[in-house]
Amino acid sequence: METKMTGTNGSVDSIVFDKPTVEDGADMWELVKNSTLDLNSSYKYIMMCEFFAETCVVAKENDELVGFVTAFIPPEKQDTVFVWQVGVDTSQRGKGLASRLLNALLERDVCENVLYLEATITPSNEASQALFKKLAQKRETEVTVSECFTEDLFPDDEHEEELTFRIGPFTK
């Protein structure tokens, strides 16, 4: 399901959005390792590519991974897609790729019945907060922020609380 996206100036850009394969897992891990994002095990990225490919998106330029979204639809919330992580290569930052990745996810057939998108974000992660608020604004819907995981739940002392950002409902 390769999708070439049209750039803001009307030209077709060279970024292709697709479902990931297990081979993409290592590249996702490497991208996160070289960023400020929380690095999960390499197994997590490979597993997401294998078992949740329908709800994950990779962005490639010249066959090189430049961004991704890992997400899933929780079994008890079939109207919600939960975004675990959004990663964008430094070469693509500030170009709207994260927004395009989220929109590519929401346009997938698997998200046909999705009315909400959720993600957890730390209070200090202003870039992610802005990304999800912008998504809500562009889709003309609401953002609700609520407490999710408090600091005391995390075994390491450096982890901030995680807030749930719930965007929706979406209209089709």
From Swiss-Prot:
InterPro entries noted in UniProt: Acyl_CoA_acyltransferase, Ectoine_EctA, GNAT_dom
Entry keyword set: Acyltransferase, Transferase
Pathway: Amine and polyamine biosynthesis; ectoine biosynthesis; L-ectoine from L-aspartate 4-semialdehyde: step 2/3
Start and end residues of each N-acetyltransferase domain: 15-166
EC number, UniProt record: 2.3.1.178
Classification via Pfam families: Acetyltransf_1
UniProt record, GO biological process: ectoine biosynthetic process
Gene Ontology MF term list: diaminobutyrate acetyltransferase activity
Domain of life assignment: Bacteria
Family named by the database record: Belongs to the acetyltransferase family. EctA subfamily.
NCBIfam families per UniProt: ectoine_EctA
Name the record gives this protein: L-2,4-diaminobutyric acid acetyltransferase
Lineage: Bacteria, Bacillati, Bacillota, Bacilli, Bacillales
Gene that produces this protein: ectA
